Regions:
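AAA+ P-loop NTPase catalytic core and its hallmark functional loops
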Residues: 1-169
Length: 169
């Protein structure tokens, strides 16, 4: 899909509260498109790189609750707690299998452990394809099945129009 088609399709997925995954070569504008969408919607885009995290970072940090005799999980500070926005898992498939697996529940039910994604937040991910030789980890079915997948293709005329409109030379 061309960038303009991607933006339209991602907006439709966000409106329907369906997580979406953008696939495309490095540098074609996947991330920029998500930040453009966030700006148009006037919402925060929170960029999370699973490749920089451990599996426990998604679920949270274990904390004993001695009073109740249970272990609770303190959510990571990169996970939103209020407001509206797009939780953007950029370069999702650069993360190892265990770290990707830690996000399964978040993509399906919008929660993981004790953490629940606020109602005003949506999930978008992006990554490179195997043919891009980007050292990716193939996404397991349980994660892949929780998203709509869109192929992002570079389009020279659209890029030139974007560059001219934004003073890029």
């Amino acid at each position: 899909m061309k960038p303009s088609q991607i933006i339209s399709a991602v907006n439709a997925c966000l409106d329907a509260r369906i997580p979406v995954m953008l696939w495309g070569a490095a540098g074609v504008g996947k991330s920029d498109s998500i930040f453009q969408i966030g700006a148009k919607r006037k919402v925060e885009v929170r960029d999370v790189r699973l490749s920089n995290l451990d599996p426990t970072d998604i679920k949270g940090f274990p904390s004993p609750d001695a009073k109740r005799g249970v272990m609770t999980w303190l959510p990571a500070d990169f996970l939103p707690t209020t407001g509206k926005g797009i939780l953007f898992f950029d370069e999702l498939n650069l993360a190892d299998k265990m770290t990707q697996a830690s996000a399964y529940q978040l993509f399906l039910t919008r929660q993981v452990g004790n953490y629940k994604l606020p109602a005003g937040w949506d999930i978008v991910a992006a990554g490179n394809t195997e043919k891009d030789r980007a050292n990716i980890t193939r996404m397991a079915g349980p994660l892949a099945n929780r998203m709509i997948h869109l192929d992002f293709e570079a389009d020279v005329p659209e890029w030139v129009a974007h560059a001219q409109a934004n003073g890029i030379s």
